[in-house]
Amino acid sequence: MTFGEKLLNAASTRGRLCVGIDPHESLLTSWGLPVNVDGLAEFSRACVEAFADTVALVKPQVAFYERFGSAGFAILEETIQTLRERGCLVVSDAKRGDIGSTMAGYASAWLDPASPLSSDAVTVSPYLGFHSLDPVFELAEQHGRGVFVLAATSNPEARELQDQQNADGVSISQQIVDQAAALNAPYMAQGKAGNIGVVIGATLSKPPRLSTLGGAILMPGVGAQGGTASDVDEIAGDMAHLAFPNVSRSILATGPDIAEMKNSVAKTAADFPGFPRS
């Protein structure tokens, strides 16, 4: 089964919501936790308890674990494994991008079932060339895992690069979406969602066209950054059933109380229902 189909199945019962686990320093402090490995572990375990049984897709931000070295990665491994064991899909927000054997190494780290960091999906950067990512696409195809390619991100600095156009007037972000769509096309022809998704900001005024993508759309910018459910639907259009807004700040702000975080998830997810699956 493709990652896209797994995600649609999860959304049918849990809604189309992606919740981030972002244990940055100020959030650890606001939770009353020490800014060290112990605080990281406690934060992560609370998030697992709040999200594992309620959210379709959870997105740990790898950088906040990586900063603590091997001990941080050990906590990330535990977090990913526990979430997946409890039926939650996990996208590791690693934003990896390289070429050749190095990209193959990143692909194995995040998508190979034998890896201790094995996740359902990973975020990647295409700016060494879209097909520099072929090793991760190939491993995703082999194991039914997902890849989210940065296409049109929500940070304002991105516009000067991602909105640039080629000689035919096609923006870089649109070219990325179109190349992802080409990889998903065989599945879309069968009425299925493919393995290759894109990252599209929910606050963009001129987003790329997504009507032929045929894969999942990860949409940061909802909630604290100002994006709304109507923004998600307008940008995603015919692909709205595959649009998964990423909400982190507003939900994590209700922690460390697990019940409060669960309530926040439920309220937010109500704006992004899934669709029944036959």
Swiss-Prot record:
Molecular function GO labels: orotidine-5'-phosphate decarboxylase activity
Annotated catalysed reactions: orotidine 5'-phosphate + H(+) = UMP + CO2
Pathway(s) per entry: Pyrimidine metabolism; UMP biosynthesis via de novo pathway; UMP from orotate: step 2/2
UniProt xrefs under SMART domains: OMPdecase
Keyword Lyase listed: yes
Top-level enzyme category: lyase
GO biological-process terms attached to the record: 'de novo' pyrimidine nucleobase biosynthetic process; 'de novo' UMP biosynthetic process
Designated name of the protein: Orotidine 5'-phosphate decarboxylase
Organism field: Corynebacterium glutamicum (strain R)
Gene: pyrF
